[in-house]
Structure formats: C-alpha cells, structure tokens
Amino acid sequence: MYTKIALLGLVGSAAAFNAPMMTVRRDAIATGAAAAVVAPMLRPAGAAMKKDSKAPCVEVFDERDGCKAAGTQKASGDDGFCVKVSMKAIKMNAAEATSVTKNYNTKLL
C-alpha cells in the first residue's frame, strides 16, 4: 500500500514539473534569437602588434670585487647584485637572418 502511494507521489511530482511543449519551443526560439544578436560581438579581435621591435634586455651588475668592508659578511640578503631590465630596440641583421633560414632544421653534428 505504501509503495503504491510513494509511486503515485513520484509520478504526480514528475507530471507537475513537466513543462508544456509550447513554452519549451518559445524558449528555444528566444534563445536562438538572442544568440544571433550576440554572436557578432563574440568574434575575436585581431591582435595588436607593435612595429618598434623592442625586446626586454636584462643587465646584471656585480659589486663583489673586494671593495666591501670587513664587517659586512652577515646574511642580510644584500649580495651586491643589481639587476636592470630595460626595453631596447632590436636591429635586424640580414646576414644572421639568412644564416638562420639556411641552417634551420639541419643537424649540427
């Protein structure tokens, strides 16, 4: 008896949540129309490329040449190095480019 009541309850709840076909079709058409409006906005833009051919150049300066005082041997995190990063224009070298294209994909040994 209880199993029949539970089964009827499950069937009744499933029937209550079943949406009519008309609303499903209407929602599908509205979703398709919204996608057609938004689709042109989702196209990827072309990547912007700078024409100045600059690349980061890293320079490391070292002051550990024996000029330090005798009392500065503690581990303070100051190791006497300085790092400079700057953007520099890279010049085109036609001979180097020809060498790379000529020797590309060849065995060195």
Swiss-Prot record:
Residues reported to bind (2R,3E)-phycoerythrobilin 3: 64
**Lipid bilayer topology:** Peripheral membrane protein
Q: So which domain of life are we looking at?
A: Eukaryota
Residues reported to bind (2R,3E)-phycoerythrobilin 1 = 52-53
**UniProt KW keywords:** Bile pigment, Chloroplast, Chromophore, Electron transport, Membrane, Photosynthesis, Plastid, Thylakoid, Transport
Q: Matching InterPro entries, A to Z?
A: Globular_prot_asu/bsu, Phycoerythr-like_a_sf, Phycoerythr_a
| Location of the protein in the cell | Plastid, Chloroplast thylakoid membrane
The UniProt entry, under Pfam families, shows: Phycoerythr_ab
Using the UniProt record, give the first listed, main subcellular location: plastid
Q: Which GO terms describe its biological process?
A: photosynthesis
* Ligand binding ((2R,3E)-phycoerythrobilin 2): 63, 67, 72, 74-75, 84
Q: Which GO terms describe its cellular component?
A: chloroplast thylakoid membrane; phycobilisome
Q: How is it modified after translation?
A: Contains three phycoerythrobilin chromophores with binding mediated by both the alpha and beta subunits.
Per the record, the similarity remark reads: Belongs to the phycoerythrin family.
Biological role stated in the UniProt entry? Light-harvesting photosynthetic tetrapyrrole chromophore-protein from the phycobiliprotein complex.
Q: How does it assemble?
A: Heterotetramer of 2 different alpha chains and 2 identical beta chains which form 2 alpha-beta heterodimers within the heterotetramer. The two alpha-beta heterodimers are rotated to an open configuration in contrast to the closed configuration found in other cryptophyte species due to the insertion of a single amino acid, Asp-65, in a conserved region of the alpha chain. In the open form, the central chromophores are not in physical contact but are separated by a water-filled channel.
Note, other? The light-harvesting system in Cryptophytes contains phycobiliprotein complexes. Unusually they are composed of either phycoerythrin (CPE) or phycocyanin (CPC) but never allophycocyanin (APC), with only one type of biliprotein being present in any one species. Unlike cyanobacteria or red algae these proteins are not arranged into higher-order phycobilisome complexes, and they are found in the thylakoid lumen.
Q: Per its record, how is this protein called by name? A: Phycoerythrin alpha-2 subunit
Native organism is: Hemiselmis andersenii (Cryptophyte alga)
